[in-house]
Structures are given as structure tokens and as C-alpha cells.
């Protein structure tokens, strides 16, 4: 059983989470929030009844519901959690996720990348040494393409523009998601939405059929776009497709035949069929949670213990002279990790240095994401090039970054732990 990440506020002041919130979205679209994950670590907020809710708070409401459901099932309190995040989440988004857990009353023991969690779920049952690729694909963009097609076809047939009807659009989006699922197993999906909208005094109904071939035309370019990250992952790992032992498909959209065919062409491997793409990420997180409680993790059939080593998804750097992003930690570095490097001054007799912390792969600072800034004051006045400033990056197992700067001559030191609040102040 899964819980949709949807939160709704009824006009009576009641808060609904999960399937209950999703069911009433048609009649209450302005007070229903979904897909909040993409707003984590940003300034985004939504105002309901005079109260502003940030993404962390909405996410915490979902976590509270999961906590409550788990406690009912287990019959005991749940106080700790392992939370999975998309691999592309930056440091700010990870800290915001941890903040959401704290708001929900949970001690977040670890933040783990979703593909890593999926691989862990698979590895527990397959002890042989091998290289595994995780092909993790969400479905929101696919749903949007189907929704647009339905709106367009409906307008062609009736003249009514559904995009201006919030209630109708919610029903269309739900139908689009269901059609996508049906087309993973069937050649066509019949979309019937009675009493969808009124147009010129007439009640209109939707009755359309979408074929698998039409779906492939709608989403073909999106599937093609997965080629670049797949090839990039192989290149970063320094391996050829022939060296892969398995390819794991994660996310419900990987059930789409065209997606699986693209994966075969890119990796020259049949996808592994013995994991549930909807559940494997959560299972891996549960396994990690068990190990954090002191339980050993043994691969099936081998008796050998497994060790989980996650990686940082993006390079970390500071801005240096000329606006250059000077890297201290490369992407795909195993966590936890620490790295220090000594820098010097560019201006004679300057008494402070600004540390501008960046995340990304571009050579110039302006083209990367700023995740923090701080100033080290009180350095010894000396000609340019004489002071020795040691900058250290320390990333814990959750991917949370601490940056420090120390004048090796005076001992003056300043540090910052990058949090969502730091990034937005």
C-alpha cells in the first residue's frame, strides 16, 4: 500500500493527507497541494486561511501521516526514520527534507539517494559481486503530455477549453495517470469522464481512446532524453554496457514498454524482473534503517556482510579569483568524506576573505548554484599571496555539508553548516 503525497485543507478546517486528500482534489483544487517535493529547499509557500505553509511543512504533514499509519500497524511508537530523496537533490533540498522529518517528530537517521536504496534492496537478495545500474524514471511529465492530448482532443470535438476549469483538469490529470498505467499492459485505454464540464449551457462528457502507439508518439522525446544520463552514468563509472550485471527499473513509468525497449538499446541488457519498481526504494530504506539499529546486513547465499556507501551527486566548489569555481569535492565521491585545500589572498593586506560555496559542474561560479556564503575575518595583514587560508569541506553520511575556513597563521576560524535557511537568507 502506498500513500499519495497529497495534502488538502477542507473549508471546515480539516486537514486530509494521502488518498483522502487526492479524492477530494476535484471539488477542492485551490486547497489541495501535491508534488511538493519539487519545491523543497526553495522560497515556495502556499497560503491557506491566512497561514503560509512552506514545502517543508507540507512534506512534514505527509510524514506525520506515514508515522501514524506505521504506529497503528506496528503497535508501538515510531521515532526514527530513513528518508529517500532523488539523486539530483542538492544540499539545500536534502537539509529541507531532514527539516521536514524533524517537524513531523522524527529523528532522521539518514538521507539516502533513491537509486542507492533500490540497489540495496536488490543486493540483499543477490549476493554475487556485480555492477548494477538503476534506471529511475518518474512519470509526471508523461502524465502531463497525456493530459495535454486529452484537453486538445476534447476542445477539437466540443469547442470547450478544459484548461480554464480547475475541477475538470484535476479529473483529466487523474484519468491521464490511469491511462498511462493501463497502456503498460494493454494496447489501448478508454477514457470516460461523465459530466466533465459545462459549455454554452450544455453538460459535456469526455469519451476518448488513447492507443499505445499514440502514447509513444506523445512521450517519445521524453524517453529519448534518458539516453544522455544513462551514457553519462556509464562514462562516470568507467564501464561499458557489457560489464553491467543487472539493470534495475525503478518508478511506475518504467513499466511502459517503450521505456523498457529504450533501456535495452542503451544498456544491451534485459531489465531485472524480480523487484517491484514501486516498492524497492522503500524496501532499501527499511533495510538501511535496520542496519543503523545495529543489525548486520548479509547478502543472500553468501554469508558476507554488505556495506552501503552512498555518493555525492554534484561537485562542490568555492569561488576564486576571476569568478572561477574551484572544486574541492568531485561528484560521485563516496560519503562520508572530508577534503581540505590551502588558498591565499589576491589583494595586499586584506583582513578578511569571503567564502562562496557552490554546487554544480560548470567551470564558472555564476553558472553553478550558490548554497552558502560566509566571511572569515581577522586574517593577518600581509602582502598578496602570503596568508595561508585552509578551506575544508566535510560531508556526512546524509550528504549534509559543513564548510570551514581557517587562517593557518592566526588560527582564526569560521564555519557554516549548509541548511535550507542558510541558502535563502
Region spans (language model):
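N-terminal phosphate-binding loop and flanking beta/alpha elements of the actin-like ATPase fold
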Residues: 1-4, 9-174, 202-291
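Conserved ATP-utilizing enzyme core subdomain
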Residues: 171-198
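Short loop/turn segments at connectors of secondary-structure elements within structured domains
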Residues: 77, 91, 128, 185-187, ...
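Long alpha-helical scaffolds in large eukaryotic adaptor/regulatory proteins
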Residues: 122, 183-186, 292, 296
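Solvent-exposed beta-strand sheet faces enriched in polar/charged residues
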Residues: 84, 192-194, 250, 274, ...
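Short loop/turn motifs enriched for small/polar and acidic residues
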Residues: 84-88, 177, 194-196, 250-252, ...
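Glycine/charge-rich, flexible interdomain linkers and switch-proximal surface loops
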Residues: 119, 164, 168-171, 190-195, ...
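Acidic low-complexity intrinsically disordered segments
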Residues: 1-3, 8-14, 68, 107, ...
